From Swiss-Prot:
GO biological process, one term: translation
Alphabetically ordered keywords of this record: Ribonucleoprotein, Ribosomal protein
NCBIfam families for the chain: rpmH_bact
A GO MF label: structural constituent of ribosome
InterPro entries attached to this UniProt entry: Ribosomal_bL34, Ribosomal_bL34_CS
UniProt name for this protein: Large ribosomal subunit protein bL34
Organism: Azorhizobium caulinodans (strain ATCC 43989 / DSM 5975 / JCM 20966 / LMG 6465 / NBRC 14845 / NCIMB 13405 / ORS 571)
GO CC terms, sorted: ribonucleoprotein complex; ribosome
Keyword Nuclease assigned: no
Keyword Ribosomal protein on entry: yes
Matching Pfam families: Ribosomal_L34 (PF00468)
Top-rank lineage group of the source organism: Bacteria
Name of the gene encoding the protein in the UniProt record: rpmH
Family per similarity comment: Belongs to the bacterial ribosomal protein bL34 family.
Length: 44
């Protein structure tokens, strides 16, 4: 059986990266929430 996590830097950036988050309203909400929480890393 193939494992579920098959790492790929490109897919990671495209799906969870900063620009992907900023592209949608809810994504911007996530970034804002992580900023308010004082996260060191905002996105992948």
């Amino acid at each position: 059986m193939k494992r579920t996590y098959q790492p790929s830097k490109l897919v990671r950036k495209r799906r969870h990266g900063f620009r992907a988050r900023m592209a949608t309203k809810n994504g911007r909400k996530i970034i804002a929430a992580r900023r308010a929480h004082g996260r060191k890393r905002l996105s992948a």
